[in-house]
Amino acid sequence: TWIKVQDYLGQLLAGGEHALLMLDPIPWFEANIPNNAGLYHVEHGDNGLIYIGESSNIKERYDTHSGTTYFSALRRHIGTDVLEFELHVRNGKKRYFAESEDKEINKYLHNCKIKAMKVNFGRFELEEYLIRKYRPLLNRKENK
């Protein structure tokens, strides 16, 4: 059985890609994200697909991305790469934006849509496959 699964890897990844792409994108702040392990895909009106991520709990990750910047790589990349803000040091960590800049990141997210799907097995592989294939603007894992 294990050998058969390995033989079908390409088909499994293509199936996961198809399932994600078939989902309707939901405006960022209107999304009702499932409380499960899974994968999410973020697109922006002007920039198209900007980020693909995975999490053991995509609802919690979505909430993190919707809050302030400290724990959110997506928010940091929007701030530095798109809006060209500088990260500030606080408590010895360079992971903060000014409050006004965090508000600008929220404005950017208002122009984003998200797709999220439950993935119990293979989410790391599917995330890596999709990042390599689509090279989203804000992902850093393209060097995997």
Report the location of each language-model feature.
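Acidic, metal/cofactor-coordinating or nucleic-acid-engaging core segments within structured domains
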Residues: 69-106, 111
